[in-house]
A protein has these predicted regions:
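Non-catalytic cap/lid and distal C-terminal segments of serine-dependent acyl enzymes
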Residues: 40-510
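Contiguous beta-strand segments within globular domains
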Residues: 14-23, 28-36, 185-187
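C-terminal segment of classical bacterial N-terminal signal peptides
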Residues: 2-10
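Compositionally biased, proline/threonine/alanine/serine-rich low-complexity intrinsically disordered stretches
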Residues: 12-13, 510
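Short linear motifs in intrinsically disordered
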Residues: 10-12, 158
């Protein structure tokens, strides 16, 4: 070919790989969404999907589709937006492929669900990229995860008024911010015997989930917590299972220029409403926080920013609380890059059994293909970043190169680096925060979150904050709560410690 019109001969580029994706004739249309095509080596699988613990095994390409009618088709160019490379870079081999239409733009947050349209898995046999064009027909809905569906069905069947109650309140603050009706949602878990003594009031725990979860997850967790109170392994308290999911990921109940005043709405609107409706201890020493992962960071920031409201947080495996270690990279280092260390080696983002299974660069670039909404990296920007001139959050780093934007990091530092905020505000908040921060994390945390926790711990120790940090040997992000054969045993310890603060010297065990 000719390069730049200068008559210089160049190597011929490989032809792009295309797939023909059509909407089944029996599917109601028109439909829109993000069209994803997944491809991997092999044959005979029921599903082809991204495996987060094996990020190089499956290739994925994407494009937006608008108003596709039944029987109509689109030509998917699998080279334009693809991971890990354009599909034309694939070697010849035996492959299988599947198409998914992410109709709700939620793939980055919760994966494929019943609202999404999928094709069957098509075996390409011995396939040469750029050769025969496969046709994929979107003619069925994705199946719900059977284990999750079973747990949710069981929880719904067992949720009874007076035991677990769904509460939703439209927030005037959030509605005014967004211009659309916006609500705070939760499941309220009432302790056994709540209905028998109209004079009894209870300590209250505000729980929030991690990234990828939602109100359905809260129901399942709430049912588990009530069961532990019924059997007597947890003290009688009211638990409010807050939903922090949103279209952009998780809002963390943080006050943000992008997501809105979620913290203010929770503390000035939702909690006062709940305390009128239920017999809760309406005082700081009777309000506690518990959350895991992104929910762990959310509960840390709520305690730091609203210590007059909450009497303590028990946060587990929280997202980074000191940005000198943001799952590894020091965001404040000169010429910081979140993909590569100064020596050029990759920053990992996930480990399993002591081995790196994914790098931060892989994690970010997969998310970018799946869609510019709802992913973990994008979610951080929606919570922490200033707004750009376009109205979207500014990216903390360049998603192609990994180079950090110092201007954005300075904003993150001033508003959301919790270690910095506690140090800055310690003279005013010491009396309220001392002894109230409890943090649990595994020494083998899957996302390296123990690193940031150690830095936060050290800075609180210098302040004399009487913080309580527990590093559980060998535990990862996903088995932290296990005690012996009990996968949720840590809840018992946390709840007992909270109850001792709310009811000093009072025994709750029968």
């Amino acid at each position: 070919m000719l390069v730049g019109g200068m008559g210089v001969a160049g190597a011929q580029a490989a032809p792009h790989v295309f797939f023909r994706v059509q909407l089944g004739s029996s599917v109601a249309g028109p439909v829109s969404g993000r069209l994803l095509v997944f491809l991997k080596q092999g044959k005979g699988d029921k599903e082809v999907n991204i495996q987060e613990f094996h990020p190089g095994e499956t290739w994925v390409a994407a494009q937006e589709v608008h108003d596709l009618m039944p029987g109509a088709a689109v030509e998917m160019d699998a080279d334009t937006v693809a991971y890990p490379k354009p599909f034309s870079a694939l070697p010849a081999g035996e492959y299988e492929v599947q198409a998914v239409l992410d109709t709700a733009h939620t793939y980055n947050y919760s994966g494929r669900g019943p609202e999404d349209l999928v094709s069957g898995v098509v075996s390409l046999g011995q396939w040469n990229p750029g050769g025969a064009e496969a046709t994929l027909t979107l003619d069925q809905h994705a199946e719900a995860n059977p284990m999750r569906a079973q747990m949710l069905d069981k929880a719904r069947a067992e949720a009874k008024p007076g035991e677990l109650e769904k509460v939703e309140m439209e927030s005037s603050l959030l509605t005014r911010f967004s211009g659309n009706a916006a609500s705070i949602k939760a499941w309220v878990v009432l302790p056994p015997g709540y209905e028998k003594d109209a004079s009894a009031h209870y300590p209250t725990v505000y729980f929030t989930h991690g990234f990828g979860a939602n109100l359905d997850y809260d129901l399942v967790q709430g049912e588990m917590i009530r069961g532990r109170m019924v059997t007597g392994t947890m003290p009688p308290m009211i638990w409010v299972m807050l939903d922090e999911s949103c279209a952009e990921g998780t809002h963390e109940f943080a006050d943000s220029v992008n997501n809105g005043p979620w913290g203010k709405a929770l503390t000035t609107e939702f909690i006062p409403m709940l305390e009128k409706k239920y017999r809760m201890d309406a005082r700081a020493t009777g309000r506690f926080l518990n959350g895991h992962s992104s929910g762990g960071w959310a509960t840390l920031q709520m305690e730091v920013n609203y210590p007059e409201v909450f009497g303590g947080t028990w946060s587990t495996s929280p997202d980074p609380s000191d940005f000198h270690n943001f799952t590894g990279p020091d965001l404040y280092a000169p010429h910081a890059n979140v993909y590569h260390r100064p020596d050029g080696t990759d920053y990992p983002i996930m480990r399993m059994d002591g081995k790196v299974v994914a790098t931060l660069e892989q994690f970010t670039k997969i998310e970018a293909v799946l869609g510019p909404y709802g992913g973990q990296i994008t979610s951080f920007d929606w919570v922490f970043s200033p707004r750009s001139k376009s109205g979207a959050p500014m990216q903390m780093f360049d998603h192609v190169t990994g180079e950090v934007n110092p201007t954005v990091v300075a904003y993150w530092h001033d508003h959301y680096d919790l270690a910095h905020l506690v140090e800055k505000e310690w003279p005013e908040k010491a009396a309220l925060l001392k002894g109230r921060i409890h943090l649990f994390v595994g020494t083998a945390d899957t996302f390296y979150l123990d690193g940031s926790a150690h830095l936060f711990d050290a800075r609180l120790a210098k302040l004399g904050a009487d913080a309580h940090f527990t590093y559980i040997p060998g535990r990862s992000h996903f088995d932290l709560y296990g005690v012996g054969n009990d996968r949720s045993g840590l809840f018992d310890q946390i709840a007992a410690e909270m109850y001792a603060v709310a009811r000093p010297g009072v025994s709750w065990k029968k």
